[in-house]
From Swiss-Prot:
Gene name of the encoded protein: PAO4
Source taxon at top rank: Eukaryota
Origin organism lineage: Eukaryota, Viridiplantae, Streptophyta, Embryophyta, Tracheophyta
Organism: Arabidopsis thaliana (Mouse-ear cress)
GO BP terms: polyamine catabolic process; spermidine catabolic process; spermine catabolic process
UniProt-recorded name of the protein: Probable polyamine oxidase 4
This protein's record includes keyword Oxidoreductase: yes
Length: 497
């Protein structure tokens, strides 16, 4: 299934919102943005620079949403989004990163989702602590790449969708030479584990027709060495953000206004609202709509999947592991495989981050933080029996956190082709942002950013048209004329330490 590209308005008319305000008795158009993740902040910044009155309502006691840089280790550790996918000027976040002088640690120089992502420097071990020969890892990786290529034939042969796991099973039946035995089979399961981590869901739920439809920007993948927090703070600067404001209801009125109700009884009124909460929150119906959203919209929301990935960060007094970017453990099933991101190589701090996705992530959320950290240490001690206990640890729970109820969206098996157009379509003066509505760059920070910009532009157009001044006004876009995206003379700072 081909995913349709996001569209941005062109042929923009001349004029400014200030000129309109003068003609409308200085009535300043107002917009409420629900959610202060990077998508909501991008939407709010865009509208603010267009002279709209913007209020951001955030349920948490912090901004950033699924971007969260923790400093309790004495160094920045991103417990949510941590990569810039597309280390190049193609990335819309590049101007901000460049202007702030932030460093990117490139973990992969290619644009692949699976084949080489994060694997330029790695160490794999079996469950008994034996290191897997790099030649075997490379050989199985090549086989895995071919297996995925063969699934394209399966996809072309059938009109019905199926899971990636089903497609792989058919490929192996047809091509027995691609089957792996013994330790090679366990390495293959590790590659499958890495694929499941990318989508934050098990392979038996990933759509074969859609899994490789995302568009990758050039430049490979880079870790934010100083964390994403500086980027978030820059976009949020001087915006009217109300923390601890959990939205419970959105009401469309007969006079083209919206009333947004907040837990505790406070109401906010505006000309329009942009909703950028995670898709998991929308799927759980934690925000009521009055009148109810139309069926075409609710079915789009319910028809998209939401995955789960959690991080368990461990700080040690010293680094005792090899100087590689990733430490991985192979096993007979992808569920039992695991891997650690080595922040010591990228930042110099003795920190390992265990990453669990899909069913494993959900199961770990059933444990206490201490029990989760103990489980992760058991995995680490299979590789390094003499590993000391961590000095500190951090555990995320994105799947059960009521502010997220999941990590990011994925395409379910049999998803309707018109789901994405319906998902991003506004309902009167209710607009939708967030990473889930970005067809091309779903699940990424820059994808969420672009979705917020797009929603704000659509919102501007709606208000201008309602006021009868569309032909006299131009949209303001962060993509072209914002101070925070002002082109700097220095290049992106890319480190390989």
């Amino acid at each position: 299934m081909d995913k349709k590209k996001n569209s941005f308005p062109d042929n923009l008319p001349e004029g400014t919102i200030s000129e309109l305000m003068q003609k409308q008795n200085n009535v300043q158009p107002s917009v409420i943005v629900i959610g202060s993740g990077i998508s909501g902040l991008a939407a709010a910044r865009n509208l603010s620079e267009a002279s709209f009155k913007v209020t951001v309502l955030e349920s948490r006691d912090r901004i950033g949403g699924r971007i969260h840089t923790d400093y309790s280790f004495g160094c920045p550790v991103d417990m949510g989004a941590s990569w810039l996918h597309g280390v190049s000027d193609e990335n819309p976040l590049a101007p901000i990163i460049r202007r702030l002088g932030l460093t990117l640690y490139r973990t992969s120089g290619d644009d692949s989702i699976l084949y080489d992502h994060d694997l330029e420097s790695y160490g794999l071990f079996d469950m008994h602590g034996n290191k897997i020969p790099p030649q075997l890892v490379t050989k199985v990786g090549d086989a895995f790449k071919r297996i995925l290529e063969e699934t394209e034939k399966i996809r072309d042969e059938t009109a019905n969708d199926m899971s990636v796991l089903q497609g792989i099973s058919i490929v192996l039946d047809r091509n027995p030479e691609l089957r792996q035995e013994g330790m090679a089979y366990e390495v293959l399961q590790w590659y499958l584990c890495r694929m499941e981590a990318w989508f934050a869901v098990d392979a038996n739920l990933i759509s074969l027709k859609c899994w490789d439809q995302d568009e990758c920007l050039s430049g490979g993948h880079g870790l934010m060495v100083q964390g994403y927090e500086p980027v978030i703070r820059t976009i949020a600067k001087d915006l009217d953000i109300r923390l601890n404001h959990r939205v419970t209801k959105v009401v469309r009125t007969s006079n083209n206004k919206v009333i947004v109700a907040v837990e505790g009884g406070t109401n906010f009124v505006a000309d329009a609202v942009i909703i950028t909460v995670p898709i998991g929150v929308l799927k759980a119906n934690l925000i009521q709509f009055e009148p109810e959203l139309p069926q075409w919209k609710t079915s789009a929301i319910s028809g998209l999947g939401v995955g789960n990935e959690n991080k368990i960060a461990l700080r040690f007094d010293r680094a005792f592991w090899p100087n590689v970017e990733f430490l991985g453990m192979v096993a007979p099933t992808s569920y039992a495989c695991g891997y650690f991101l080595n922040l010591h190589k990228a930042t110099g701090h003795p920190v390992l981050v265990y990453m669990a996705a899909g069913n494993l992530a959900q199961d770990l959320e059933k444990l206490s933080d201490e029990a989760t950290a103990n489980f992760v240490m058991l995995q680490l001690k299979k590789m390094f029996p003499d590993a000391p206990d961590p000095a500190q640890y951090l555990v995320t729970r994105w799947g059960t956190d009521p502010n997220t109820l999941g990590c990011y969206a994925y395409d379910v098996v049999g998803m309707p082709e018109d789901l994405y157009p319906r998902l991003g379509e506004p309902v009167d003066n209710i607009f939708f942002g967030g990473e889930a509505v970005n067809v091309e760059h779903q699940g990424s920070a820059h994808g969420a950013f672009l979705a917020g910009v797009s929603a704000s532009q659509n919102c501007q157009r709606y208000i201008f048209e309602r006021l009868g001044a569309w032909e006299k006004l131009k949209l303001v876009s962060l993509m072209g004329n914002s101070d925070i995206l002002e082109t700097a003379t220095v290049p992106l700072q890319i480190s390989r330490m």
